[in-house]
């Protein structure tokens, strides 16, 4: 079977392309892209007028909890959430149980993702054994099995000497070190941003300095080792300034930001104590959020990620101090970006596609996907005018801990193609995909 998308606005910054085109998919690849493509016998014709077609979206920071915490999420339910949100590829973080710190653990996730057959699962391997920050993990073995990058996400490597060692080692394999930047001796006990929120709510604060000092340290280690460095879930304006300066210097430094750090702040945490707003790193100031939006717009921050962090109801529906950090995000990321950045003219569709598809694919060392004949048909079609209200019932994820319940947003993925299979059809997940 082949698919013919008629009249889509095709946006691909790799080709300097932003035009209304027809796109024909045959088998696993794009067969033809032109102003007008005539349907062939047997083609499934999809009316894409008014919709945007982009290279498949990539989220390079998700937690699928599999293996070990399947009561929160599994590779299957996480894949369904990813497709529903418009993603063709995700990079899974290694804080599973057991920790993904060896080749067989990486291979398990890839194979399970292939069995589910919805998206490409691109596991990140741990930097250190057990993510304990003490011994180098089996980096080479994990590269051989398909690890996309390396991170001790959730903790960060506390020892500068150990971080230097892992960066020197990873630099041999054409992979990035994705750094969770947090000095735990400074952040210890913190549950909200140190400042207005901690004072107003009477809770222990988590200083921005604890993040910014480690960003600065890791940039210095990048300069020393030459290892490509990716800063995870940046949350402060000062952190963005450090990244901007590193890039100006010519260092191989990239960065990501989450929608919740772009569009929420500590001021949104009220005396209702909505634990879905408890994040790691925490929601910072409104000024930080605006600075991060500007950093996305000017390219300082390369990628939009979700840090998709599913938790069971009992882990969130409790006192703030003991509730778990994090929120789900795969199914709200695209509409949040369209609503708050594109529709407000802070970011073009070209910029959106660059941050949500092109840049993360490049950073993860994945094969480029371009909307041109001969390239793999990993594509996302979305309707930027479709309005959606976020409710618990909206989610395909096993967990419902969204920070945006009740929000009315614009822009939803309607169709997703992975290896030429239509795995999302008219906003409905298709198990195994239409071929």
Q: What label would you give each PLM region?
A:
Residues 103-120, 168-179, 332, 336:
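Alpha-helix-loop-beta-strand connector modules within alpha/beta enzyme cores
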Residues 1-4, 9-56:
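Histidine-rich, glycine-flanked metal-binding segment
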Residues 60-73, 96, 122-135, 204-208:
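Active-site mouth loops of central-metabolism enzymes
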Residues 134-304:
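Histidine/acidic residue-rich metal-binding segments in metalloenzymes
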Residues 8, 28, 50, 61, ...:
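Divalent metal-coordination and catalytic microenvironments
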Residues 319-322, 376-435:
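C-terminal cap of metal-dependent C-N hydrolases
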Residues 200-228, 294-298, 302-304, 309-384:
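His/Asp/Glu-enriched, well-ordered alpha-helical/loop segment
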Residues 48-113:
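Metal-associated gating/positioning segment near the N- to mid-region
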């Amino acid at each position: 079977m082949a698919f013919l998308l008629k009249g889509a606005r095709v946006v691909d910054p790799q080709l300097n392309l932003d035009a209304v085109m027809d796109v024909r998919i045959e088998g696993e690849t794009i067969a033809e892209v032109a102003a007008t493509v005539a349907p062939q016998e047997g083609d499934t014709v999809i009316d894409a007028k008014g919709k945007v077609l982009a290279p498949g979206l990539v989220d390079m920071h998700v937690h699928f909890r599999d293996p070990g915490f399947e009561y929160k999420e599994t590779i299957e339910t996480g894949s369904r959430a990813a497709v529903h949100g418009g993603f063709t590829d995700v990079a899974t973080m290694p804080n599973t149980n057991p920790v993904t710190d060896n080749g067989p653990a990486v291979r398990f996730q890839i194979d399970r993702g292939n069995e589910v057959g919805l998206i490409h699962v691109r596991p990140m391997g741990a930097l250190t054994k057990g993510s304990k920050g003490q011994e180098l993990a089996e980096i080479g073995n994990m590269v051989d099995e398909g690890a996309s990058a390396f991170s001790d996400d959730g903790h960060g490597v506390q020892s500068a000497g150990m971080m230097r060692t892992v960066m020197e080692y990873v630099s041999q394999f054409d992979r990035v070190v994705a750094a969770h930047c947090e000095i735990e001796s400074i952040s210890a006990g913190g549950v909200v941003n140190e400042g207005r929120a901690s004072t107003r709510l009477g809770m222990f604060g988590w200083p921005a300095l604890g993040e910014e000092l480690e960003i600065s340290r890791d940039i210095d280690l990048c300069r020393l080792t030459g290892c490509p460095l990716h800063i995870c879930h940046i949350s402060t304006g000062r952190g963005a300034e450090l990244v901007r300066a590193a890039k100006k210097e010519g260092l191989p430094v990239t960065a990501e930001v989450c929608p919740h750090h772009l569009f929420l702040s500590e001021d949104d945490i009220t005396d209702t104590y909505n634990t879905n707003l408890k994040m790691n790193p925490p929601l910072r100031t409104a000024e930080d959020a605006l600075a991060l939006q500007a950093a996305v717009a000017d390219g300082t921050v390369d990628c939009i990620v979700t840090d998709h962090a599913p938790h069971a109801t009992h882990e969130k529906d409790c006192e703030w101090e003991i509730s778990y950090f994090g929120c789900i995000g795969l199914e709200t990321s695209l509409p949040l970006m369209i609503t708050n950045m594109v529709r407000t003219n802070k970011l073009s569709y070209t910029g959106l596609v660059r941050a949500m598809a092109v840049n993360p694919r490049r950073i993860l060392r994945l094969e480029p996907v371009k909307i041109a004949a001969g390239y793999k048909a990993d594509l996302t079609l979305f309707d930027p005018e479709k309005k959606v209200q976020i409710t618990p019932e909206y989610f395909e994820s096993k967990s419902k801990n969204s920070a945006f319940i009740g929000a009315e947003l614009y822009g939803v993925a309607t169709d997703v193609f992975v290896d030429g299979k239509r795995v999302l059809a008219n906003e409905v997940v298709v198990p195994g995909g239409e071929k």
